[in-house]
Amino acid sequence: MKQIDKLIIITCLLLFAANAKADIYNSMKTFNSALLCLDSRYVDTVNVDALTETAIKAMLKELDPHSTYLSPKEVQQMNEGLGGSFEGIGVRYQMENDTLLVINTVSGGPSEKVGILAGDRIIMVGDSTIAGQKYDTNEIQRRLRGPKGSVVDLGVMRQGERELLWFKVERDKIPVYSIDASYMAAPEIGYIRLSRFAQTTPEEFDKAMGKLDEQGMKHLIVDLQDNGGGYLNSAVELADFFLPSSELVVYTEGRSDGKRNYLTRHLFDHFKGRVVVLINEQSASASEILAGCLQDLDRGVIVGRRSFGKGLVQSPVRMPNGGMIRLTISHYYTPSGRCIQKPYTKGDQKSYNEDLLNRFKQGELQSADSIDFADSLKCFTRNGRVVYGGGGIMPDIFVPLDTTTYTKPHRAVNAKGSLNKYIVQYFKAHQQELHQQYPTIEAFLDEKSGFKVTDEMVGGIIEQARKDSAQSNELDSLYTNEIFRSQVAAYLANDLYEQGAYSRIMNHTSDVFNAGMAIINDEHRYKELLKSK
């Protein structure tokens, strides 16, 4: 009898599978017939490739908000951003009056090797003029980038030279760093800001930790604000810095993939100091994995505002045309069992995209009291602290969004690009003397002898803003706006030194950063926050 029952069950399963395959086959036949009909009988010529891509996007739109189709070009751009490098000439530039102005060259990169200098203007690429052509960023990048080993001729205008200077530049791999800033925020307090979780992030983080350790770091602030995520494995490897071996960092569960645990493997030295993690409403995915893991295991204090709430795992599926479907295959869960994914309605991308705007309207970004979690979403950390799933990581210390930080005239000057235009001109005119007077970022920031933004500079920016028709009647208030002066200095320092110079100056105007500093400097309060309530 038992054998008959087994045969019945197996037969039912096989029939179910066969029916499912038949359904897919019939759907494919219907789609192919429609496509062939359009191609052969439609009144005008149709682009079959474009129609196919549109159909794929429409199918995925009916699923979750994060299953997406990427064109071959978008796949290349994604790989460059997360792969840790791209192939090109190695310059950092800005467009000024439709002309490419070199801000600086990558140290040891192709352009530096042939003698291209900061302040040079690239007028021609090969036999094509790029100056004055109103090319967008994508077109400029397309012309400058190319396979490693390929050679491009660049026609450069240099101050003091009457004719174009020509350089043969052999393209090479150019690193794209995921660490935006790394420095000692105070004696014994290190600070690392991550913009994304790329393949190279664990290696970059290890180097940054080593340098900070040499400078006497005992405690660390990890800034994940506005970090939209990246590779799950990179987040797991970063957890290795803070946790002993074999600790659960995250687990995933899906219909076809089952359950999979991700554990620490003691890849890096175990950091034992106090840890504070900064997050905000734009911190998502891999950022939430790291923050959620450290919170669940009571290894760090989370400071800021509730994170984005992306708890879905996508797997890349390559398409024959070089495109890719990023298909959601599972949910991820923090060690306490929290699913961080915020609610969504299948097919309603609009409401999902407006979630952050609705948080602002409902007052969540200004007050933690406006956030309500159901008891069914309650979980517990290792020490027994209550945490909630179902919609992002809620910080241990909530810091409201300060909407008064940037005044109306300050926003107007930024929106019109007036500040950036002025900095480009000022940098070009004073670059040499600035480097001589302030050879290091430390010299630039020195309280007594460091760089000071003058009234003349503020006046120059206001004049530029008026030329740009900046919509504000209060531009003169910028003379007494200290945050505005800090941003002017930060933009200039970013052009003079490494990229992290901007964060190093502007962090002191950030309520989230200052709250993190207050916690990490107060050992008693830090420990109390991690205790069971």
Could you tell me what each predicted segment is?
Residues Y25, Y42-I103, G149-A181, N507-M517, ...:
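Extended, small/polar residue-biased N-terminal targeting/export presequences
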Residues C339-I340, Y344-K533:
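Conserved functional hotspot residues or short segments at active or partner-binding sites
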Residues V125-G126, M157, P343, G390:
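Residue-level recognition of conserved beta-strand edge/terminus positions
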